Amino acid sequence: MARLLFSGQRLRPSFLRSYIRANPSSTPSATRAAINYRYNSNNAALQSASSSQGALTGIKIIDLSRVLAGPFCTQILADYGAEVTKVEAVGKGDDTRHWIMAGEKASWNESSGPISNYFAAVNRNKRSITVNFKKAEGRQLILDLIKDADVVVENFKPGTMERLGLGYDVLKELNPRIIYAGLSGYGRTGPYRTRGGYDPIAAAEAGLLHVTGEKNGPPVRAGIGLVDMSTGLFLHGAILSALIARARDGTGQRVDASLFETQLSLLTNVGLAWLNLGIEAERWGCQHPSIAPYDAFKTRDRYLVCGATNDNQYAALCCLLGVEHLVTDPRFITNPLRVQHREELAALLGPIFASKTIDEWIALFEPSGLPFGPINNMEATFAHPQTAARDMVIDVPMDAACAGSIKVIGPAVKFGDSKTGLRTGPPRLGQHTVEILEEIGMDAEAIAKYKEDGII
């Protein structure tokens, strides 16, 4: 970060800006102008990008993470324009390259090395380099990459990076501006810090599985890695915040995220009901613990989720269903009463929903303004008109695919002025090793020797 000479000392522009705001009359106008100019120019990578660039164009990220939470985080940052270098194990790569579904193998070119849809889902817009962490030369390569980077992301067990000589203290000494983002199962401190991090385990221990499933049934795991991806979302926001803090203060910092804490934070109102009222949470299936009716109702052919969040919506729903008399039924006049008598209300509404097809109900609900939606399978989800309208399915060229391209799910957030989206498809294992090493100054002979020695 730019430093300025002030009263014989080198001080941060952020301090100087605070000083001139507090002492405007004692600071010459030329000095104020110079300080403001230097302050606003100190981190060019975070200046406003043009419409042809991503919001994070110029930010360099070294991604040492594997599987889902970390790669999901770095893919979001890559979609926003960051240059992400994915460091993988020699010969094997990210574990998810090998997580192939039945029947999937035939869609990939065998000569392209290990690859899967699971890996492709969270690794686009990245370059891949393979490095042997077990060799000192490999660890030195990692240091060489981090020396000029803005962010490093890793999801090893706490203490692993330190044992490799790649801990935060080492990296901070090498690059004081580095944002070190560590992700683990339980965080850097506490009695469980050395345990591995797994999505279903965090979901179990931090309460999610306890509240998920049918009322009288067993706990049910979400159909996606919800805790993993939520942790990636939290971490990507923390990294952006750390970058903004660095633009202000000039130095990087450590960011510490965990699956366990992510899931604890997601308990929100359910958690506060226990903490403040001592009310234990229950499983409610598709129902809402505080609102009735709100459920997945079986129609003649599929399920429809709908509900009424207030008395006006309840009256409108009753009218739409042709049961206006239930509006004034003393059991259902207010939401607390409807919650108290939810089973009786569901028994009355269930046969009505079962009398029509999902398409017939959608036609009735569409103009009503009531909250509703069919439970869609994957075919219906990706055929949804809103999916197409928001460009949420994108064809990406990919030579590893037999078809020459694969379809991926587009970025969830759109920017008004900055470019987001797909620049490159998911990389083959080690696809960019040579070009990355050339960028840090290695010649062809040295690269060949490293390859021969199993360092890359």
UniProtKB/Swiss-Prot annotation:
Pfam families in alphabetical order: CoA_transf_3 (PF02515)
Do you know which Gene3D superfamilies this protein is assigned to? Crotonobetainyl-coa:carnitine coa-transferase, domain 1, formyl-coa transferase, domain 3
- Top-tier EC class: transferase
Query: Transit peptide located at which residues?
Result: 1-33
Q: What happens when the gene is disrupted?
A: Shows significantly reduced growth but does not affect tolerance to benzoxazolinone.
Q: State what induces this protein.
A: Expression is induced in response to 2-benzoxasolinone (BOA) exposure. Expression is also induced in response to 6-methoxy-2-benzoxazolinone (MBOA) and 2-aminophenol (2-AP) treatment.
State a single Gene Ontology molecular function.
Answer: succinate-hydroxymethylglutarate CoA-transferase activity
- Stated EC number for the protein is 2.8.3.-
Q: Does the keyword Kinase apply?
A: no
Swiss-Prot/TrEMBL keywords:
Acyltransferase, Mitochondrion, Transferase, Transit peptide
Keyword check for Iron, yes or no.
no
Tree of life domain: Eukaryota
| Alphabetized InterPro entries for the sequence | CoA-transferase_III_domain, CoA-Trfase_fam_III, CoA-Trfase_III_dom3_sf, CoA-Trfase_III_dom_1_sf
Q: Where in the cell is it found?
A: Mitochondrion
Q: Name one GO cellular component term.
A: mitochondrion
> Which family is annotated?
Belongs to the CoA-transferase III family.
Role summary: Acyl-CoA transferase; part of the Fusarium detoxification of benzoxazolinone cluster involved in the degradation of benzoxazolinones produced by the host plant. Maize, wheat, and rye produce the 2 benzoxazinone phytoanticipins 2,4-dihy-droxy-7-methoxy-1,4-benzoxazin-3-one (DIMBOA) and 2,4-dihydroxy-1,4-benzoxazin-3-one (DIBOA) that, due to their inherent instability once released, spontaneously degrade to the more stable corresponding benzoxazolinones, 6-methoxy-2-benzoxazolinone (MBOA) and 2-benzoxazolinone (BOA), respectively.
Record's protein name: Acyl-CoA transferase FPSE_08120
Query: Which species is this record about?
Result: Fusarium pseudograminearum (strain CS3096)
